[in-house]
């Protein structure tokens, strides 16, 4: 079970208005979204990098500007640091996701969505009976893996963590807290999440590599368009999965900036963009946040 890929499909490329165009770049050169944070005098204090959780073998995405920023940083802040500890991730998922006596999974969606739901379940290699004790949010995460491209072993998040080995690495959440956010969603919102995953699967099948290309190109407008019609367009899900988390992360990040730790922040691209993103939140706090690539 590739849980990080599931989570990535749900929350990594979120969406709200961000109109800043990427700097000029030679065609074909990867330029994932990278910003620097400076004080009022222009002194660079931090960096913000939008990650993706799975990539095909051989994908080139490490630019000179990115490598220079990593070298200048003093420490790393990420959603989850222990990405390689998959046994623990599976154990936490199984514990939080399992509650006996769940309603039949087909009753958790509208009748019109049931054929697509059962088709997706079949493609996971599971059966509806095997999901009889699985909570709705967990079914959504399992199904969200379908249609994705790439391998989590090649994910930008893992590569960034490896680049900071030997320096301080701080988790904003960790796996238990992150999955706990899904687990604590009201059942109504969990069902909205499941329905949204079913709808998004249809879009992903039309062009499975669309969001990956947008990430590589730093194409914020495409990422915005994708998510403005996706899971995070639901106000309650957006608040729980994006806005509230960003606010909590800002409370951890700002002291690190102010004490001169030079943090490099590497989180799902969703958490950077838009009025509710970390970029705008830092600007609202008086920092100068500028795009490097």
Range-by-range predicted roles:
Residues 1-7:
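Bacterial N-terminal signal peptides that target proteins for export
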Residues 14-17:
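C-terminal motif of bacterial Sec signal peptides marking the signal peptidase cleavage site
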Residues 21-26, 33-241:
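Structured, acidic catalytic/metal-binding patches in enzyme active sites
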Residues 30, 62, 156-157, 246-249, ...:
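Amphipathic coiled-coil/heptad-repeat helices and related helical stalk/stem segments
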Residues 236-293:
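A cross-kingdom marker for long, charged
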């Amino acid at each position: 079970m590739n849980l990080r890929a599931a989570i990535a499909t749900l929350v990594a490329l979120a969406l709200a208005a961000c109109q800043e165009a990427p700097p000029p770049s030679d065609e074909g050169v990867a330029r994932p979204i990278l910003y620097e944070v400076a004080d009022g005098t222009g002194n660079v204090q931090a960096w913000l990098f939008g990650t993706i959780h799975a990539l095909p073998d051989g994908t080139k995405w490490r630019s000179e500007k990115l490598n220079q920023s990593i070298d200048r940083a003093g420490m790393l802040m990420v959603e989850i640091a222990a990405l390689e500890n998959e046994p623990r991730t599976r154990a936490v998922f199984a514990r939080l996701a399992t509650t006996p006596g769940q309603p039949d999974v087909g009753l958790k969606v509208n009748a019109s969505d049931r054929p697509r739901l059962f088709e997706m379940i079949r493609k996971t290699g599971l059966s509806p009976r095997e999901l009889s004790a699985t909570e709705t949010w967990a079914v959504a995460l399992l199904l969200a893996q379908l249609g994705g491209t790439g391998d989590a072993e090649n994910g930008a998040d893992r590569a960034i963590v490896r680049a900071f080995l030997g320096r301080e690495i701080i988790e904003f959440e960790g796996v238990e807290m992150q999955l706990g956010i899904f687990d604590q969603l009201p059942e109504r919102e969990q069902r909205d999440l499941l329905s949204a995953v079913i709808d998004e699967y249809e879009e992903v099948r039309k062009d499975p590599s669309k969001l990956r290309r947008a990430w590589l190109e730093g194409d914020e407008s495409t990422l915005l368009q994708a998510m403005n019609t996706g899971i995070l367009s639901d106000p309650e899900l957006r608040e729980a999965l994006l806005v509230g988390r960003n606010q909590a992360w800002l409370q951890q990040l700002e002291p690190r900036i102010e004490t001169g730790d030079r943090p490099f922040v590497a989180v799902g691209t969703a958490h950077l963009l838009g009025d509710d993103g970390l970029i705008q939140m830092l600007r609202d706090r008086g920092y100068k946040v500028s795009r490097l690539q």
